[in-house]
């Protein structure tokens, strides 16, 4: 098992160059679009990349934490309000796959993963999750030997390129001369130490991921005892090791220009007989980390040679392989039935708890009873129509300027072919009409009712007279439009004024929070009459509250269903059930389901989809639960 370490190091320079040539725009966007606390998970050598990513991410003012897969199991309370990112070279070890499944059940905001092997089991897992963003790279060097080498350099390079704050990262290895000089230093150092020495690795700042990696490599390849500490924590008692065990101890000092002064001051106070090796770089920030990582590999290679051990193939005992492949999931898996798990995650969404056990006994009883009553009532009801929101419900963010998701179309045509009514309640206008006409056969158009501009206007899909933009524009909306257009915002904003609605959009969605509060403040200072602010998954709508209500579509659908000889009750599905979400009225009805945000009310607007299944995927799940009878539709949980 393994590969010669020296052969692995020969490929490092090309691997680094390769990593900087890869496209990382999508990776950067996925990580930074929704800046929440970030929990980063990795095992073995990949954990070093996790610590590097912590430093990169925290440059943007948000906390991050690197943990192992087992740590994740004991950290479930923090996952729901965080983003999660998995780092794995192969994407197939038991630990990473089990922890990924655990994270899915905790419903983090985003579930990201990055892997150096396409079509891995990790990638296949991610394809089942609505909130997942998976990034596969095809590392030219293939799998590493026993220790993480080229995959680790590739992770460092890709992550640095994606997240470097200055976005001007250029790494040029100096190289041979620089590395040869360092090799000479290591030879001198190993003349002073022996295999039974303890290595005290001191670090700070961008050196920290390298300290983590040195501890990992020296322990995994059995090259030496390692103690790691930052320069100042070393002064809080850890220095005592040198006093009692200094004869068999040495120091490995990781130094960038930022640590040089603190290192010099520290070592002036230590016994002069203590051997010290400086692994040093003249680079700062992410570049400094990468330079130190490569030099640390040279140190590991030299340490192995001094002991007659090849770090890339040190020899692994049988029990080591058994430990690596240990099947331990049953220890941590709960035996709850699928229905119980679904009930608990639905209650967590409603109650805003981090985990179910955060609720008191009284709260658990209250919400369990509410869930049982809601689902029982839902499954007893008989429907003649289904009313859907558009954006975030049947049209995902990736298609927000185009058509609805193709996966949902067969479910809609099934509903229509069974003779029932489909309602679409949207904040948009004619673009939705076009999308529906493009997707659904014309013979079904008379069964489709559209509520345009948050249902200010309602008409059939085959009606060419709606929406009518010739209607008189509300004066209050016109005044707000003029105010916002004249204001100097820090990013580009687009405004579309309609008779009873002003739609506000921003091209770069990740910058929305920079202007959202300013827009609301300006509108509220105007103190307009009958004006309300609503938000969808892709825009903000300022509406004339006196004529706009998404429930305006309900009576149209009921009448159409009755005319077809169907029951007149409606099933409502949307994504923004909590005000200012633009479905808060639509999902206030008793038989209403959310595919994302829920309201706090216990008798409506439940999200009962599986963990981490949301938006269009959740809509598809709900539609798959429909059972069609001659004159009504039943909803059956599965």
Q: Each predicted region: which residue ranges?
A:
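Glycine-rich phosphate-binding loops that contact phosphosugars or nucleotide phosphates
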Residues: 25, 31-176, 204, 245-282
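Conserved acidic, metal-coordinating active-site core of Asp-based
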Residues: 487-571, 576-586, 590
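Mg2+-dependent phosphoryl-transfer enzymes with acidic/Ser/Thr/Gly-rich catalytic loops
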Residues: 340-368, 381, 553-638
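Catalytic-core regions built around general acid/base machinery
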Residues: 30-33, 99-103, 189, 403-419
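Phosphate-moiety recognition in structured ligand-binding domains
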Residues: 2-11, 113, 128-130, 247-346
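Asp-based phosphoryl-transfer active-site loop
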Residues: 379-402, 583
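Active-site phosphate-binding/coordination module
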Residues: 128, 403-498
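Active-site phosphate/pyrophosphate-binding segments
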Residues: 2-36, 130-248, 321-341
């Amino acid at each position: 098992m393994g590969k010669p370490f020296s052969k692995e190091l020969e490929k490092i320079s090309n691997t680094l160059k390769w990593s900087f040539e890869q496209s990382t725009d999508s990776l950067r966007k996925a990580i930074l679009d929704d800046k929440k606390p970030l929990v980063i998970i990795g095992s073995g050598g990949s954990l070093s990349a996790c610590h590097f990513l912590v430093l990169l991410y925290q440059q943007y003012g948000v906390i991050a934490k690197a943990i192992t897969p087992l740590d994740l199991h004991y950290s479930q309370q923090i996952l729901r309000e965080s983003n999660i990112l998995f780092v794995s070279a192969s994407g197939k070890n038991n630990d990473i796959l089990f922890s990924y499944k655990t994270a899915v059940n905790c419903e983090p905001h985003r579930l990201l993963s990055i892997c150096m092997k396409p079509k891995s089991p990790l990638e296949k897992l991610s394809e089942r999750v609505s909130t997942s963003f998976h990034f596969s790279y095809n590392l030219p060097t293939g799998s590493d030997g026993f220790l993480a080498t080229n995959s680790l350099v590739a992770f460092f390079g890709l992550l640095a390129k994606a997240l470097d704050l200055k976005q001007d990262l250029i790494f040029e290895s100096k190289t041979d001369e620089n590395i040869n000089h360092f090799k000479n230093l290591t030879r001198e150092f190993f003349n002073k130490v022996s295999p039974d020495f303890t290595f005290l690795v001191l670090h700070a700042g961008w050196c920290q991921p390298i300290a983590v990696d040195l501890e990992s490599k020296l322990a995994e390849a059995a090259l030496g005892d390692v103690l790691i500490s930052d320069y100042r924590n070393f002064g809080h008692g850890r220095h005592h090791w040198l006093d009692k065990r200094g004869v068999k101890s040495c120091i490995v000092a990781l130094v960038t220009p930022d640590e040089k002064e603190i290192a010099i001051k520290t070592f002036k106070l230590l016994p002069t007989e203590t051997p010290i090796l400086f692994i040093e770089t003249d680079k700062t920030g992410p570049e400094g980390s990468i330079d130190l990582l490569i030099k640390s590999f040279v140190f590991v290679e030299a340490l192995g040679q001094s002991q007659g051990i090849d770090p890339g193939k040190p020899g692994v005992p049988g029990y080591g392989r058994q430990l690596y492949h240990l099947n331990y999931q049953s220890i941590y898996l709960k035996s709850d039935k699928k229905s119980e798990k679904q009930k608990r995650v639905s209650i967590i969404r409603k109650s805003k708890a981090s985990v179910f056990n955060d609720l008191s006994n009284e709260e658990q009883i209250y919400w369990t009873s509410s869930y049982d009553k809601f689902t029982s009532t839902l499954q007893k009801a008989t429907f003649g129509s289904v009313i859907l929101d558009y954006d975030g419900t049947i049209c995902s963010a990736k298609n927000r300027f185009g058509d609805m998701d193709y996966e949902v179309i067969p479910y809609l045509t099934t509903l229509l072919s069974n003779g029932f009514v489909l309602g679409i309640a949207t904040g948009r206008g004619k673009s939705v009409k076009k999308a529906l006409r493009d997707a659904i056969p014309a013979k079904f158009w008379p069964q489709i009712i559209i509520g345009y501009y948050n249902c200010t206007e309602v008409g059939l899909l085959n009606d060419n007279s709606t929406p009518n933009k010739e209607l008189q524009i509300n004066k209050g909306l016109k005044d707000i439009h003029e105010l916002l257009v004249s204001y100097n915002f820090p990013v580009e904003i687009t405004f579309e004024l309609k008779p009873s609605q002003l739609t506000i959009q921003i091209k770069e969605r990740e910058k929305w929070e920079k202007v959202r509060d300013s827009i609301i403040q300006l509108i509220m200072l105007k103190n307009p009459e009958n004006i309300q602010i609503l938000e969808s998954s892709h825009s903000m709508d300022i509406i004339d509250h006196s004529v706009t209500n998404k429930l305006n579509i309900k009576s149209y659908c009921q009448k159409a269903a009755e005319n077809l000889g169907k029951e007149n009750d409606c099933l409502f599905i949307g994504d923004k059930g909590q005000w200012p979400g633009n479905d808060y009225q639509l999902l206030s009805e008793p038989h209403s389901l959310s595919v994302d945000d829920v309201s706090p009310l216990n008798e409506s607007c439940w999200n009962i989809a599986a963990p981490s299944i949301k938006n269009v995927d959740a809509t598809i799940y709900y539609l798959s639960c429909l059972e069609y009878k001659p004159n009504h539709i039943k909803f059956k949980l599965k």
